[in-house]
């Protein structure tokens, strides 16, 4: 009984939570429970991976704080509260690259778009700030540019294994 309790405690009471209470299909709930409860280590990041996650998270937070301070009241569709999106996208792209993916297209709503453009796609701070100042410079094929968060962007992303996607 102690082993079962320890296993369940380690699975469900750690630093990462799982929200499956809203799932209504029994087979889907069973799938998640089996995956969660059969794994000894759900996530085991190396020190290098942890540093990259922290760096990406920090970039996202600092960018949001700066925009919120510099452009008070400006419509920017902040990612505040959802900054983990940035290291998550970084992880998804890195994992995809390891499986042979060579190109990624990101389509998303306005919320967090500027942060993704800068911290995932590599759009420069200068380009974003120029757009805030009304100096829209860029490729006209990357969106109509009527507002800063409609502008598109294309780049090469460098993965943690120095691959370009």
List each language-model region with its residue ranges.
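Structured alpha-helical segments in the cores of large, soluble enzyme domains
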Residues: 52-64, 85-98, 140-159
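Cofactor-binding active-site loop characterized by glycine-rich and histidine/acidic residues
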Residues: 105-165
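Extended, charge-enriched "interface" segments that sit outside catalytic cores
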Residues: 1-85, 101
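Active-site pocket-lining segments that scaffold enzyme catalytic pockets across diverse folds
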Residues: 66-126
């Amino acid at each position: 009984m102690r082993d079962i309790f320890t296993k369940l405690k380690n699975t469900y009471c750690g630093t990462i939570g799982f929200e499956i209470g809203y799932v209504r299909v029994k087979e889907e709930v069973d799938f998640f429970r089996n995956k969660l409860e059969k794994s000894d280590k759900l996530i085991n990041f190396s020190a290098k991976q942890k540093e990259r996650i922290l760096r990406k998270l920090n970039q996202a937070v600092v960018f949001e704080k700066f925009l919120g301070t510099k452009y008070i009241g400006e419509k920017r569709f902040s990612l505040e509260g959802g900054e983990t999106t940035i290291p998550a996208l970084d992880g998804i792209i890195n994992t995809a690259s390891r499986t042979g993916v060579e190109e990624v297209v990101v389509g998303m709503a306005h919320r967090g778009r500027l942060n993704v453009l800068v911290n995932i796609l590599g759009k420069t701070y200068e380009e974003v700030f120029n757009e805030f100042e009304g100096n829209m410079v860029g490729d006209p094929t990357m969106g109509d540019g009527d507002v800063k968060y409609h502008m598109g962007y294309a780049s090469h992303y460098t993965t943690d294994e120095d691959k370009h996607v």
